[in-house]
Amino acid sequence: MGGESSTGLTTRQADMLILSQPNSNVRYHLLTPMPNGNFVPQSLVIRFELEPHCKDGDLPVIHPSEEILLLEQGQLDVLVESETTRLNAGDTTVVQSNLPHIVSNPGDTTAVGLAVFTPAIWFPNNRRSFNRGGET
C-alpha cells in the first residue's frame, strides 16, 4: 500500500502536467492520467488557477464536452452565450456541451477550482475558439 501504481491510473502531485500558454493568466493542472495504450479516461479533471481581474481567453471557447465547474477559492463569472453566472467559493455550475463560454475572475484574489469534462477532451486539439463569425 502507498507504493507506486503500476497501472498508470494514479497521478502524483509531483508528476502532474501543468498547462498554460505564453502570456496567459490561467494554469491548468491535469489531475486525470493521460491516455495510454491500456486506458483512455472517459472524463478529464483539471484544477485551474485564474489570476485576479483576468479571463481564460480573448474569445469564448466551444467544445463537445459537458463542463462542470467547482470553485474552491475566489470568484468566477461564467459567461455562457449571453448569460453570466457569478460563482463564489463552494459554488458549482454546469456548462452544457457545444455552447460558447468564457470564464473571468472579477475578484482581487486568484480563483482556484476544479473542472470536469465529460467526455474527456485532450488539449489542445479539441478546444476550439468560437467567435460570432463561426468557429476557428
State where each predicted segment sits.
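Short, charged beta-turn/beta-strand-edge "cap" motif at the junction between a beta-strand
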Residues: 99-102
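Short histidine-centered beta-strand/loop micro-motifs
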Residues: 56-63, 104-106
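Double-stranded beta-helix
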Residues: 106, 111-136
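A short glycine-rich, His/Asp/Glu-containing loop-to-beta-strand
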Residues: 17-59, 116, 121
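Short, charged recognition helix plus adjacent turn
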Residues: 2-27, 132
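Short, conserved beta-strand element in jelly-roll/cupin
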Residues: 47-51, 61-78
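Short acidic-glycine-tyrosine-enriched beta hairpin
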Residues: 81-97
